């Protein structure tokens, strides 16, 4: 799902941006939540929204909203006393989703994120942080969304779990054609895993584009108070202090090899 906002008025700001289709989009900056609210159409608006190059009409707004799932930073605490199956079944009831075989739908949603059906009988409160996050992904899949919005969560995981979850998201894009938005203040994470990045400041989009290009603009990021990804900063320092031509890398091993080769 490609989403384009043009001259969209939100919280006294005016925003224009594009959420790219079938990829991981990163959103960061002071007004990052404004972008989420725009995508979710939380307020009446002035401006233009197009979905897959078709202008969104008033009569289509409810249908559009049905195509989006939001994964909050934490699983809803009211479900902590529930078993996984009860939690997922309750979500189907709450959103009034009419499905002939809800158990099959729940199992399919679990297996889509590589969880065994034995999880259905486990209590939510007994799950690890990474297991809870996978359950949240599974909950999102219950409604077959075209767009999944993931709010800040990655700081809770070790590197191995972080990589596993992001590989899973990439597979969901490849196999199911999903579009994903990750909202995060962690530019190291965005640099490593996203393809398209939007940075907000002063109630507008400061810059957007290919992540590797946007987050390598070190001087620009510094001027605007945006945290520079560590891998970018290390390479930038080596380039500037040693006056050598080395490339920016996402893989730490490639970066170290390049620095040692030239410095």
Segment roles from a protein language model:
Residues 221-263:
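ABC ATPase nucleotide-binding domains
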Residues 190-192:
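A short, surface-exposed alpha-helical micro-motif characterized by mixed small hydrophobic
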Residues 204-228:
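Conserved beta-strand-loop-alpha-helix hinge in the C-terminal portion
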Residues 101-119:
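Conserved ABC ATPase "signature" region
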Residues 183-185:
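H-loop/switch region of ABC-family ATPase nucleotide-binding domains
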Residues 47-56, 63-65:
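Conserved ABC transporter NBD signature motif
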Residues 74, 80-95:
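Q-loop/switch helix immediately C-terminal to the Walker
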């Amino acid at each position: 799902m490609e989403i384009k906002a043009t001259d969209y008025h939100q919280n006294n700001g005016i925003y224009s941006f594009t959420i790219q289709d079938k990829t991981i989009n990163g959103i960061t900056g002071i007004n990052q939540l404004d972008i989420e609210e725009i995508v979710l159409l939380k307020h009446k608006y002035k401006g233009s929204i197009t979905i897959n190059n078709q202008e969104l009409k008033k009569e289509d707004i409810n249908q559009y909203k049905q195509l989006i799932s939001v994964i909050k930073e934490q699983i809803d605490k009211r479900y902590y006393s529930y078993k996984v199956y009860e939690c997922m079944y309750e979500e189907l009831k709450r959103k009034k989703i009419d499905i002939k075989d809800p158990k099959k739908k729940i199992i399919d949603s679990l297996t889509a994120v590589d969880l065994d059906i034995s999880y259905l009988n486990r209590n939510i409160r007994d799950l690890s942080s990474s297991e809870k996050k996978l359950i949240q992904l599974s909950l999102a899949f219950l409604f077959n969304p075209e767009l999944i919005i993931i709010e800040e969560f990655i700081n809770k995981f070790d590197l191995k779990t972080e990589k596993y979850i992001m590989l899973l998201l990439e597979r969901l894009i490849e196999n199911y054609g999903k579009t994903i938005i990750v909202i995060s203040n962690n530019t190291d994470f965005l640099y490593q895993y996203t393809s398209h990045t939007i940075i907000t400041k002063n109630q507008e989009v400061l810059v957007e584009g290919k992540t590797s290009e946007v987050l390598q603009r070190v001087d620009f990021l510094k001027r605007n108070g945006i945290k520079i990804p560590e891998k970018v900063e290390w390479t930038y320092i080596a380039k500037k202090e040693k006056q050598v031509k080395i490339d920016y890398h996402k893989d730490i091993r490639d970066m170290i090899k390049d620095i040692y080769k030239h410095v």
